[in-house]
């Protein structure tokens, strides 16, 4: 139980800016981190929905509310995944050979493609969030989106080949196996079912679309880069949540 509690706090401190007790790195606890990744999604989702609830009670104008709500998951994660999105976008959009793309991915310099990509992402995501609010949809969906995205993301991390000597391969993949994969996929399926029975078919479509786009992106990244790492995982997660918001605005 102590190891599990330590794993929760390690996961919180690693993937969010939410204050939590600090622990020395523990390999026994580390093998549970990916299984707990969806739990981080639950916390982020609950705070995401809470931000909507508070802003709506304050009668904040919809356009401003959309902008503020949009920033919540990025702020809670310290822009960790958005950074990965920018790095991978820079590499993939360069249209260079595989070796050059990998070199660009490792380069800390902010490239033009990464800037263009993040600006377009946030503009379209803002439009999607504004539309969702304008349609008076059930915003409890904000709780489920981060759980679903992290369940699939965690599954990819424990099941897919890593790029080089990735820190993810060392810290998260070691000690995991088929049981972890089944648990993470099971959580995604459970979230989809709960979404359907509590919110309805349109919300389920958004959750399923997130899963579909994640596998499409995985195939693309594996083809062009050869595997995944932390940046790639962040890239996929950001676009999964983007897809969820966009689909809710469209359907």
Curated annotation (Swiss-Prot):
Keywords: Cell membrane, Cobalamin biosynthesis, Magnesium, Membrane, Transferase, Transmembrane, Transmembrane helix. Pathway: Cofactor biosynthesis; adenosylcobalamin biosynthesis; adenosylcobalamin from cob(II)yrinate a,c-diamide: step 7/7. One of its GO terms (cellular component) is plasma membrane. It catalyses: alpha-ribazole + adenosylcob(III)inamide-GDP = adenosylcob(III)alamin + GMP + H(+); alpha-ribazole 5'-phosphate + adenosylcob(III)inamide-GDP = adenosylcob(III)alamin 5'-phosphate + GMP + H(+). Its cofactor is Mg(2+). The chain crosses the membrane at residues 36-56, 60-80, 110-130, 141-161, 181-201, 202-222, 231-251. GO terms for molecular function: adenosylcobinamide-GDP ribazoletransferase activity; cobalamin 5'-phosphate synthase activity. It is an enzyme of class 2 (transferase). One of its GO terms (biological process) is cobalamin biosynthetic process. InterPro entries: CobS (IPR003805). It is a multi-pass membrane protein. It is found in: Cell membrane. Its EC number is 2.7.8.26. Belongs to the CobS family. PANTHER family: ADENOSYLCOBINAMIDE-GDP RIBAZOLETRANSFERASE. Joins adenosylcobinamide-GDP and alpha-ribazole to generate adenosylcobalamin (Ado-cobalamin). Also synthesizes adenosylcobalamin 5'-phosphate from adenosylcobinamide-GDP and alpha-ribazole 5'-phosphate. This is Adenosylcobinamide-GDP ribazoletransferase. It comes from Clostridium perfringens (strain 13 / Type A). The lineage of its organism: Bacteria, Bacillati, Bacillota, Clostridia, Eubacteriales. The gene is cobS.
């Amino acid at each position: 139980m102590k190891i599990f509690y330590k794993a929760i706090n390690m996961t919180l401190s690693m993937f969010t800016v939410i204050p939590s007790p600090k622990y020395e790195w523990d390999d026994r606890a580390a093998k549970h981190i990916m299984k707990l990744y969806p739990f981080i999604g639950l916390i982020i989702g609950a705070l995401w929905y809470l931000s909507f609830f508070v802003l709506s009670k304050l009668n904040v104008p919809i356009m401003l509310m959309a902008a503020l709500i949009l920033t919540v998951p990025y702020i809670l994660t310290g822009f960790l995944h958005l950074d990965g999105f920018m790095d991978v976008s820079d590499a993939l959009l360069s249209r260079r050979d595989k070796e050059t793309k990998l070199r660009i991915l490792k380069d800390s310099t902010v490239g033009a493609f990464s800037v263009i990509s993040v600006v377009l992402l946030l503009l379209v995501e803002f439009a999607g969030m504004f539309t969702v609010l304008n349609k008076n949809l059930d915003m409890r969906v904000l709780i489920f989106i981060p759980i679903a995205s992290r369940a699939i993301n965690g599954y990819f991390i424990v099941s897919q080949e890593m790029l080089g000597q990735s820190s993810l391969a060392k810290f998260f993949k070691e000690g995991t196996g088929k049981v972890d994969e089944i648990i993470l996929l099971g959580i995604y399926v459970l979230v989809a079912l709960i979404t359907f029975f509590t919110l309805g078919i349109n919300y389920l479509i958004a959750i399923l679309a997130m899963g579909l786009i994640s596998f499409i992106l995985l195939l693309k990244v594996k083809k062009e880069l050869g595997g995944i790492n932390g940046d790639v995982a962040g890239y996929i997660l950001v676009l999964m949540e983007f897809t969820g918001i966009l689909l809710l605005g469209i359907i």
